Amino acid sequence: MKITKIETIPIRLPTRRVHQWASLTTPIGVYVIIKLHTDQGLVGLGEAPVLKDWGGDYGKYYGETPQTTVHIINDILSPALKGQDPSRFESIHALMDKAVKGYPYCKAAIDTAMYDVVGKALNVPAYQLLGGLFRERIPIAHSLGLMEIDKAVAEALQAKAEGVKTIKLKGGVDQKRDVE
């Protein structure tokens, strides 16, 4: 099995609000979906969460926007991986690192798609390739950005009503406010 092409599809999911934390304000729900195509007609799916101020050394060098993600995958990583066997995970990691420094979300999307397509080729779920099922369900958390306290309380209560058991609070702008 060989990689024939990697397709990129930028998407934006609807969100309730802009997410703000101490280091940045950014839209959330922005992703690039990838489809890793093979010569056997199988397609593996992956996704890159796009955060322009994150990646690499705290986003200092490799913040990933939808545009940079599409460029890095289409113009650098896809040509470097064309013709490669997607089941050779470590080899592909080395090829990606040789092709471009950083861009961990781009590379993670390809990595996920490789596990997906190899699992499809072997007729097993991708988690079997990673050591087997660890848990039946995955608990989720809800992240509250920086916002007025009454809005944060209302959002936390709404998340709790929706079944969320873990609430993550953001702070770091004003210590007194953070304690309150």
Task: Describe the residue ranges of each PLM region.
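Structured beta-strand/loop patches that form or line metal/cofactor-binding pockets in enzymes
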Residues: 1-57
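Metal- or metallocofactor-binding catalytic centers and their adjacent structured scaffolds
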Residues: 5, 37-121
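Beta-strand segments within the central parallel beta-sheet cores of soluble alpha/beta enzyme folds
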Residues: 5, 92, 127-132, 170
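Glycine-rich anion/phosphate-binding loops
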Residues: 26, 103-111, 149-153
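A general lysine-centric signal
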Residues: 35, 107, 168-170
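Glycine-rich, aromatic-flanked loop segments that form ligand/cofactor-binding clefts
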Residues: 105-106, 112-144
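Metal-dependent enolase-superfamily TIM-barrel catalytic cores that perform enediolate-based chemistry
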Residues: 131-180
